[in-house]
Amino acid sequence: MSTPATTTQAFSLKTRQPIADEDALLTEEDRILKQATKGEDCTTRRRACKNCVCGRAELERKLEAEGKLPPEGITMPPGGCGNCAKGDAFRCANCPFLGQPAFDSTEDGKVKLNLTDDI
């Protein structure tokens, strides 16, 4: 048995393949669905969204149970991720509280120090 004289390439790095247009692949129904699923950000609302994933809903339920939730709701820290109170390990890159210790989320970034004597 002899091998064929010519070989074919399965791919080539030299020729550039045309890239498919993503918008051409979507139907009108897909575009409407995509616009409808864009949710609002919890940071712009007074209360947590119905389908909250940032942890604000759990925090509000906990504060409501303790009776600490003000009637206007809680204000999220300016970072927007909702993890500013947890500490540097959980904060986003543009968090204004980077480098500060963890704090209670109801205190708006104020850290309580115990300045009493230990003696």
Curated annotation (Swiss-Prot):
Pfam families for this protein: CIAPIN1
Main localization (coarse): cytoplasm
The keyword Metal-binding appears for this protein: yes
Record InterPro entries: Anamorsin (IPR007785), CIAPIN1 (IPR046408)
Protein keywords: 2Fe-2S, 4Fe-4S, Cytoplasm, Iron, Iron-sulfur, Metal-binding, Mitochondrion
Binding residues annotated for [4Fe-4S] cluster, in chain numbering: 81, 84, 92, 95
Annotated region (Fe-S binding site A), positions in chain: 42-54
Cofactors: [2Fe-2S] cluster; [4Fe-4S] cluster
Assembly information from the UniProt record: Monomer.
Role according to the record: Component of the cytosolic iron-sulfur (Fe-S) protein assembly (CIA) machinery. Required for the maturation of extramitochondrial Fe-S proteins. Part of an electron transfer chain functioning in an early step of cytosolic Fe-S biogenesis, facilitating the de novo assembly of a [4Fe-4S] cluster on the cytosolic Fe-S scaffold complex. Electrons are transferred from NADPH via a FAD- and FMN-containing diflavin oxidoreductase.
Entry comment, domain topic: The C-terminal domain binds 2 Fe-S clusters but is otherwise mostly in an intrinsically disordered conformation.
Name the record gives this protein: Anamorsin homolog
Gene source species: Leishmania braziliensis
Lineage: Eukaryota, Discoba, Euglenozoa, Kinetoplastea, Metakinetoplastina
